[in-house]
């Protein structure tokens, strides 16, 4: 409650929760640090706050999620009046990760792209049925509740990121990101020295990013 009060004072009016899944087995398999119980506790707490709206993240197309479970998750989050925005992503398995190792060792099955496509279609149908809009390939919202911050990414507007690993962009050709280590980040703030990595985008970099983002 104290944190929410502080956020209100700072003008924050939306909180994004990385639920990923509402299935304990799936959370464990994807090496998520939180539990289903913690997710539900956070949802129930934040849903009581009338000054805050919520965005949630979900993952589909996993080896552990059936079509019926996916429908159930989509319907479940609609029961929370504060949830006005959804980011939904198909699971991808990156090289040199625990999941990639498990696939290579046949511990878990590889991603079924046909299954992911079916669940993507179920998502589109659900969004249409509840009257929301799909305004980006992975982002959906109640009318009037697009993510302003994320929209800045897609429209190449400047943005500023706070916290460890947070990325910022000057709107032209400089992109920079903060120290990723929590302890080192806090120490840097205490010493008033804000170390960050900087990338200067070339004209080709910007053109490639423009094409990639606009395809979404």
Tell what function each PLM region has.
Residues 1-216:
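C-terminal scaffold of the Radical SAM
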């Amino acid at each position: 409650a104290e944190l929410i009060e502080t956020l209100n004072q700072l003008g924050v009016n939306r909180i994004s929760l990385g639920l990923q899944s509402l299935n304990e087995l799936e959370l464990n398999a994807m090496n998520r640090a939180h539990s289903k119980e913690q997710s539900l506790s956070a949802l129930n707490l934040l849903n009581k706050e009338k000054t805050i709206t919520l965005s949630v993240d979900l993952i589909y197309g996993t080896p552990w999620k059936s079509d019926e479970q996916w429908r159930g998750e989509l319907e479940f989050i609609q029961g929370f009046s504060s949830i006005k925005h959804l980011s939904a992503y198909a699971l991808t398995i990156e090289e040199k990760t625990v999941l990639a190792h498990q696939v290579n060792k046949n511990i878990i099955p590889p991603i079924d792209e046909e299954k992911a496509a079916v669940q993507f279609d179920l998502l589109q149908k659900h969004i249409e049925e509840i009257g929301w809009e799909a305004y980006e390939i992975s982002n959906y919202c109640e009318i009037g509740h697009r993510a302003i911050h994320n929209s800045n990414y897609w429209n190449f507007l400047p943005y500023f990121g706070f916290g460890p690993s947070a990325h910022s962009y000057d709107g032209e050709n400089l992109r920079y990101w903060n120290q990723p280590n929590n302890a080192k980040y806090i120490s840097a703030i205490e010493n008033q020295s804000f170390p960050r990595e900087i990338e200067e985008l070339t004209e080709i970099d910007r053109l490639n990013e423009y094409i990639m983002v606009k395809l979404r």
